[in-house]
Amino acid sequence: MKVAVVSIGSFDTQYSDYHIMRDIILGLLERGHEVNLIQKQYLETPQYPQQFEKYLKGQLQVQNIRFEKKAKADLKARYLADLSYYKQACTLMKKDKPDKIFLQSNNTAFFTVFYAKHILRCPILYNEQDIFPENAFFAGILSESSPVYKVAHALQKYAYKNATALSTISDDMKSTIVTRYSIP
């Protein structure tokens, strides 16, 4: 089976989910699946975990999308940059025609879920690890009455309801999604 794995980060850097993504990809490869990893590229020369070496150019194809990090305080620029990245990822998946898609947690998931469902007509597993905008609400950055919160909440709800499957990293996160988004 051909599985597209769309990462929020890059193996160029040790981001917070590095080990989880590495292990998911290795698990798929060890079970005989072909994996097309789509990831951001921050450095001039892409880097990968050593465990990937025996699979590169065989079962594992990697497509790097150049990405420039935006200032952490510039939420709008970061959101638009991520949306551009996922648009490019969807274009790559349209060419590759995966059998299934694994989408890592991100703030613009609605776009990739919509594209997978309606354009590619491909099953998509959305792996939620950081519930946006709930994380901003719980941190006191956004209020539930703000337009930004309402729009972001509606877009994430679309992603949750329309993904073929949804996975979370903890039971309390699952409970939050079920409760705050009315997802069965």
Residue locations for each model-derived region?
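N-terminal subdomain of nucleotide-sugar transferases
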Residues: 1-50, 54
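Acceptor-binding helix/loop patch of EC 2.4 sugar-transfer enzymes
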Residues: 8, 12, 67-76, 96, ...
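Helix C-cap/helix->beta junction micro-motif
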Residues: 31, 96, 119-122, 162
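A conserved catalytic-core segment of Leloir-type glycosyltransferases
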Residues: 37-96
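An aromatic- and histidine-rich active-site surface loop
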Residues: 45, 78-88, 98-134
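Membrane-proximal helix-turn-helix segments that form the acceptor-binding/catalytic region
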Residues: 90, 110-119, 132, 146-166
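Helix-loop-beta element that forms the nucleotide-linked donor phosphate-binding surface
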Residues: 162, 167-168, 174-184
